[in-house]
Amino acid sequence: MPHLAMLGGNNVQAPRSPAPYGRLMSITPHIVVRGAERAAAFYRDAFGAEEVSRIPIPDGRLMSIQLRIGDGLLHLADEFPEMGVLAPPSIGGTPVVLALNVVDAEAVFAQAVTAGAEIRQPLADMFWGDLHGQLEDPFGHRWNISQHLRDIPNDEVVAAAARAFA
């Protein structure tokens, strides 16, 4: 049976094949927030997200807003407590960190903070070769913002990690 994919903002569905076994597949995070409409606006202002599609339901909540951030997709959904679908504030935090790799980490970091993100870890030149920092968005999701600066051999990264966490 073919899978269905939502295409663009026109909600047209078309068949597509599942990725062949052994082929690279992509993961699209589907995060839960309190206020998907507000979250979509925040992600637009913070990260330049563009809305691809949305699925509202009759009670006014949004089952999904699909956003494009750079080359990736992010789905947002309002909370559905009756189904156990809860946002970070409802569960006391988040066990997941979203990673956003960018060309200019300083600019993206500043833009996200201006939009309302809170700094959890300031940008710093890290031992694995990235300019890296962490933000928490107003909806309780954490974001690692990284800019690759230089390639470092894995054995050197492992040794540096051992020193950093000793």
Task: Label every PLM stretch briefly.
Residues 2-30, 41, 47-136, 146-166:
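Vicinal oxygen chelate
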Residues 33-37:
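Short acidic-aromatic low-complexity motifs
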Residues 139:
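Conserved ATPase active-site switch/coordination loops adjacent to the nucleotide-binding site
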